[in-house]
Amino acid sequence: MRRSSLVLAAALLAFAAGVPARPLHDLSRADTATDALVAAHGLPGASLRLATGAGEVHRRHVGSHGEATRVPIASASKWLSALTLARLVEAGELRWDDPVGDYFPEAPAAVRGITIDQLFSHTSGIATEEAACLSARGVTLQQCALEILAQPLAWAPGNVFAYGGNSMQVAGAMAERATGRSWDAIFLAEMVAPLGLTGTDWTAAALREGYVPNANPRIAGGARSTLADYSRVVDMVLAGGDVAGEAFLSPQTLAVMARDRTLGLPIADSPDTRTDQGYGLGQWVEARDVHGATTRVSSPGAFGFTPWVDWRQGSNGVLLVQGNGRAMREDINALQRACLDALEPVRELQHASPPALPGPRAAPVRLDATGRAH
């Protein structure tokens, strides 16, 4: 606290004397790493935005990128989908432990006991080889889910971590049956309207402007988004679920989502860049404290788009790029490290807390599809 006071006092004195205060964060390494990433991988551009509990501290576009740049985000879609389901859970329309059989009684007996929690943590036992229906035209989400459920299980549910998108497709279809609404309608009501998203939908390959509907959205990897939109998402997560002082989600729900589901489980299938990390619900667990509580989460995509939230440090970041994510991953990790290092010296000035340790708060105020509280 004493050091924080000295830092703030020095800045105020410099301002009063007409001398420019030293920037609170030196992000020159991050800027250099961003430029190097673009050059090394022949990217058309890149966008980087960083924030702390006090607000945005850095936003930069390189090359052809700008505020309107919209890209497919691949597996960063998983985090959006998980947050969408979390809204339904808090509204009482779903539970994380709801089994498949409650919504698909016609499914084979072997899969009826699989829960939404397992479907969204890659522990369902469903095979990871991509189902053909994920990319099929003229197929609905319901039809795709039934096709996936009809296949033999690769592992016993809850016994193995195996990364893949098939299981999340089933969870999305369960949400449709639970609410009686399409995934598009759910997403528009639970994410787009209350968060003020203007460039995010589930048609990754589309070139049209606006929100383009999709009868069979790829729940685990089919979204496209912008720097501004995803920044709103990670700002909400960093703030423990708050949006402009009102509860979008509770800290308890975010803590449940961030809990590592891979502990004690054999790893049957995982991206080669993520073998040392855990997994929660739609998000990777990148760091933990000495007690094992999650302190940093992320959801990088195959094309390089990388969002993260670090509760211990009180910071978040979104890197928007489109290229070969596997080839870029080492350089992206170095860029993320440069960002975290730049924000680290002043972490005591931030006020964000891990959602596992929520402070006292008033009863949650839920935002509806129009942004009104109720």
Predicted regions and their residues:
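Active-site SXXK
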Residues: 34, 48, 54, 71-97, ...
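A short, well-structured edge-of-sheet supersecondary motif
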Residues: 35-66, 96, 134, 138, ...
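Flexible glycine/proline-enriched surface loops and loop-helix/loop-strand junctions
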Residues: 65-68, 151-157, 167-169, 211-219, ...
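Active-site helix/loop module of the DD-peptidase/beta-lactamase fold
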Residues: 67, 72-76, 88-131, 150, ...
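Active-site-proximal alpha-helical segments within enzyme catalytic domains
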Residues: 119-122, 167-174, 219-243, 252-254, ...
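Active-site Gly/Thr loop motif
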Residues: 199-221, 225-228, 258-318, 349, ...
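Short, gly/Ser/Thr-rich active-site loops of penicillin-recognizing serine hydrolases
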Residues: 326-374
